[in-house]
Amino acid sequence: MPSLAELTKSLSIAFENGDYAACEKLLPPIKIELIKNNLLIPDLSIQNDIYLNDVMITKRILEVGALASIQTFNFDSFENYFNQLKPYYFSNNHKLSESDKKSKLISLYLLNLLSQNNTTKFHSELQYLDKHIKNLEDDSLLSYPIKLDRWLMEGSYQKAWDLLQSGSQNISEFDSFTDILKSAIRDEIAKNTELSYDFLPLSNIKALL
């Protein structure tokens, strides 16, 4: 059985090479080793520098797991990884809470909720985030799902569509939800069109959809 260090190195190489299927195979044995070493769920009462360094590595492993799950469209797995990252991201320990992937993964989590049409949980999570992250909408990544939700709620489907078209702001993972959300917009337009018009020419329907 390879050591935790060897498995982690293999995971890093697979992720950098875009081999997300290999990542998914490596992650279960890595998580077993993390559990054995009391690292999967951080004990924030331990202030030992060596332990804190180890849990920082654990955080990066979980982030790789979350991003690999998005790339393989395994959204249930993504949600599990994100929930495991929450104790890190919302820790009072600055070192644990900060990450260059934090905004991206929170945004992906919100997009995942929107794609499930789980607006109740979306707004509940948004309230929580608003208490823990200052000026949410000033963050270009976090503002993406927030604007999308607002425009869908307002019925500003063209704005929402244009945002999805412009898409990803160079964040390829956002595109994992684009088709699902575009389909939701089409369904809403079709439903509203059916309610609004007794008769509508085919050419007009094509323009709306």
Describe every region a protein language model picked out:
Residues 82-209:
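Alpha-helical scaffold segments of alpha-solenoid architecture
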Residues 1-88, 148, 158-159, 163-167, ...:
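N-terminal alpha-helical interaction modules that lie
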